[in-house]
Each structure stands twice: as C-alpha cells, then as structure tokens.
C-alpha cells in the first residue's frame, strides 16, 4: 500500500533524507545544489520565476520592483533567485519570506507586498483558484527556466531506475501528453478551472530526451 504525506518547501528534503518519505512529487526544482543531498528522476516539467501582482499594478517586469516590497515562499529556489537578482541589479527591493504559497498571495492581497515571485505555473494556479481571478495578473519575463522532477533518496540507483523507467514509459507511450492536456489545458472539476497553460518547448524536447539534467 502506498501512503501519502503532505510536505512543505522547508521539510521536503529532510523528510527524504531521513527516510520518512521515499518519493516526493511536487513543484520541486531539480538543481545541482539539491543534488548534493537527494536524487532526482527524469524532469517532467519546466517553469520560471515570474510575478503575481494585483490587476492594474504598475509592476510589469522585475525592473519595476525597484524600492518596492516583494514576497516569496521560504525554502524555494525562487526566493534565492530573487535575492540574487536584487543584489546583481541593485534594485533595493525588500524581500519578505512567507511559510507557503497561499500566505505569500495573502501578503500581496493585503497590500503588505507589491508582488509575489514564484514559478509561473504555480502563480497561474493560484490566480485561477482565487475568489476573483480578474483581480490578479501574472507579469514579467521568466527570470530563469528550471526543471521539476520527482525527488528521491540519494545513493539508491535501483530505486531511481524504477522511477525513471516509470516516467519514461509514460512519456514514450503518449500517456504523459494526455495527462498534461487533462490537467493543464482542460477544465478541472469541481470548479471547472482551466489553467490554459501550453506545454513549454523545453518539456516537449524532454519527452524525447528523457533527461534528468539539473538546473545550474
């Protein structure tokens, strides 16, 4: 029997490392830093950091963040990307941390921050699920493209091969594309929310490449 356990951005890696969780399926970026602690299967999604703002906000790009307040979720790569961007471009925005994505959105909704920086696909989901989606906008170019992958314990090549073979099987058979269309390009019950998110070129390419290459 397969058991499930909810994890957070902060505890997902420790729970894999200590054996509490065998496999983590979520919005987890496969990068070189994390690969020192855990292993990753074949990349199954690609996304980039963008900004969620209130509709009508003057913020249209990261350059508009100068001197403003920005929130992101603690323990995510997005938080690190924004911190580096702030220093590299000398934007002098105040970067705030929130415990999870809904809290980050609430901080912007309450006017305590001007923008929420996060993976664009997660922002599309939060916007679509909001009480009034028209009150929100996802803006700016993606700051970087990062792959998502299933995270599992390090130094267990047999288990990684099992997970890789399973993901590769879905991609080779065409089942992966059917699942993508169902969840990202069709109305989802019970509310009928449609993310209307086209498949990225990076993901299309990886359906053939079957790569587990990390982000830098």
Question: Where are these predicted regions, by residue range?
Answer:
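Extended ligand-binding regions for polar small-molecule ligands
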Residues: 1, 68-69, 76, 124, ...
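Bilobed "Venus flytrap"/periplasmic-binding protein-like clamshell domains
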Residues: 1, 28-29, 46-105, 120-124
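Short helix-initiation/N-cap motifs at beta->coil->alpha
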Residues: 3-14, 95-107, 144-146
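Hydrophobic residues within well-ordered alpha-helices
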Residues: 16-17, 65, 108-109, 150, ...
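Ligand-binding clefts/hinges and TM-proximal coupling segments of bilobed small-molecule sensing domains
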Residues: 77-95, 135-136, 167-215
